[in-house]
Amino acid sequence: MHGGQGPQLLLLLLATCLGAQSRNQEERLLADLMRNYDPHLRPAERDSDVVNVSLKLTLTNLISLNEREEALTTNVWIEMQWCDYRLRWDPKDYEGLWILRVPSTMVWQPDIVLGNNVDGVFEVALYCNVLVSPDGCIYWLPPAIFRSSCSISVTYFPFDWQNCSLVFQSQTYSTSEINLQLSQEDGQAIEWIFIDPEAFTENGEWAIRHRPAKMLLDPVTPAEEAGHQKVVFYLLIQRKPLFYVINIIVPCVLISSVAILIYFLPAKAGGQKCTVATNVLLAQTVFLFLVAKKVPETSQAVPLISKYLTFLMVVTILIVVNSVVVLNVSLRSPHTHSMARGVRKVFLRLLPQLLRMHVHPRAPAAVQDARLRLQNGSSSGWPIMTREEGDLCLPRSELLFRQRQRNGLVQAVLEKLENGPEMRQSQEFCGSLKQASPAIQACVDACNLMARARHQQSHFDSGNEEWLLVGRVLDRVCFLAMLSLFICGTAGIFLMAHYNQVPDLPFPGDPRPYLPLPD
């Protein structure tokens, strides 16, 4: 057992000695490099030398885009490379040591900051170590969570896309002191934001369409001042509108459809129609308030969804106005309003045929003349009309009464005539007719009075029915008009969003895709 532990102890002591020796070499190298080293001085052998600083941005997470604050929050890794002639060494002098890890606060830094931050945090999240190679080149990859400003265009919200950027510049050095440039790989400049598929977390609201990078010179800032040169990383992102479609647009469309369906209520139910339309209007106001809390408070543009909600509110208000007008027309009567001939022709003949509506046909002219004769009457008290006219004007009960009355008189005359032309019987017959004449006349007058009253009531009911039919036709016309307006307006507004697509190329007029070449 003791013999098996001997080799293990020997290997452990050998590894400890080698580690201590290697650590001693790093300590010795670090002590040699940091001797008389000043991290505040620019690493230039001559004053005219320019230090080249390369930048590369790796995006790990697009956290959020706050539309109201116009702030983009991202989680990134900033890769910076530069060379410091004071940190060179010969690996042979340090037993082949090729990489030295040095705290970033101990070496000179190019003072690169995010120029368009919104929270005042210019520094990285963690000052990790830098990697120094024997030729003095430094590689630094600190992580950072940045909140950068992003101008929001709300014109097509929620079917919009935004162009955000992260602007990096040196806070203290001008173009004559350092030269900012994009990192290179295989002789090609990395003109895009690098995304590692294994480390990147997809955002649930935004999709990245383009991610170019550019080196820009600010024409406003003089070249001898800091901030003249900038490295800008762009993010062209498109919103995923499913959340707003499901939670705002679809419920609003369904609620607005209820306002359209109130036309299926009777024309006289104007009060119920106005109540339903008012409730729909209140619901649309709530949706508009929810949208207003999401978008920035700007007067430069009106969001597309706000335009649509306003359009639906206008349609609902028009429906309320239509309901009031239809109710006013439906409750008219011949005593208050006389129907013009043109109104009767358009709303009772022409439009019902076009709309395939079933309305009661208008009475023929012969019946109208008979009604006038019945109202005027004759001097003898009998209405001057034919049998066909009477059949068309009088109700069935009055026709039966009049028929029995006529049959009784004829039957009495026939009975008197059957007994022969005796003088006595003729005189008795004439006397009986003379005695019965006032009673018959009173009966006839009473029948004519009842007929006139019945006719007046029938005329009044017919007038009410005509106004009600006009209201029905007007209600149907308004329904078709509002339905067409609702469909066309909805389709037109959302077709505007369909044509608002992210361009195929990130910069107009520049044919380069700013993406890595395919393998």
Curated annotation (Swiss-Prot):
* PANTHER family the record matches: NEUROTRANSMITTER GATED ION CHANNEL (PTHR18945)
Leader sequence segment = 1-22
According to the UniProt record, one GO cellular component term is: acetylcholine-gated channel complex
Q: Which GO terms describe its molecular function?
A: acetylcholine receptor activity; acetylcholine-gated monoatomic cation-selective channel activity; ligand-gated monoatomic ion channel activity
Classification lineage? Eukaryota, Metazoa, Chordata, Craniata, Vertebrata
Could you tell me where this protein is found in the cell?
A: Postsynaptic cell membrane; Cell membrane
InterPro entries recorded: Neur_chan_lig-bd, Neur_chan_lig-bd_sf, Neur_channel, Neuro-gated_channel_TM_sf, Neuro_actylchol_rec, Neurotrans-gated_channel_TM, Neurotransmitter_ion_chnl_CS, Nicotinic_acetylcholine_rcpt
State the reactions this protein catalyses.
K(+)(in) = K(+)(out); Na(+)(in) = Na(+)(out)
Protein name according to UniProt = Acetylcholine receptor subunit gamma
- What's the stated role of this polypeptide? After binding acetylcholine, the AChR responds by an extensive change in conformation that affects all subunits and leads to opening of an ion-conducting channel across the plasma membrane.
Q: Which residues lie on this side of the membrane: Cytoplasmic?
A: 330-476
How does this protein lie in the membrane? Multi-pass membrane protein
Gene source species? Rattus norvegicus (Rat)
Its gene name is Chrng
